[in-house]
């Protein structure tokens, strides 16, 4: 909504409140991962720049015992060996300069800033997928394209590690068209999730797992120049993210620009917790 009351530093509260609401809404809606629905998000206490995520090893299957039997098992032998993975926070910020010419739309400012925050957020999370268990394309499809058999193989690899939980997949925008052409859209069933990016990005299930499209699953954003990633299949134990305080917004008068600086920021990070719980399918040929 345009409002001339914001000009020359008047009614900053009227500018701050709707702009922040629009920014937070846009960021949450545009991000696949910020909500924690796919990649779990951990809240980091204020003042901390790092959080340790515990990783517990699996223990052997229990042995059936009778009432008369002497277990003969030291409790130490059944305690899993634990370790911790660090997630370091980085500060991501974007700025918009609003001039004193009237006609300020808080919804539009919030949409642009929120989308920029969501982009940085999703790129950071997607970069971690490069450290998952690698799988080369099967070669049954044209170079750089994804076949259904590749997804089946990845699911089998993850299940073979003992992972029995829910899996999900992220498919690159480049591989999406070829995959849909291979199997036909009629083979897919719809799904309902909690934000618009997950609803719009979701395009079906293969091997029982929901698949989503992401434009950030590529060699440029992931820094894998010699390997072209086409899909990532994983459980929620593979990669986790961390965030401190959510999306923030600050507004300050900038006389030299004859307007305001509106800065949106988020403190977040992500890391691979267990690379065996996920597979990155790539074309390294």
PLM features per residue range, with description:
Residues 61-64, 178-181, 271-273:
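Short helix/loop capping segments that flank catalytic or ligand/cofactor-binding pockets
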Residues 101-109, 225-230, 247-250, 254:
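Short alpha-helix boundary/capping segments
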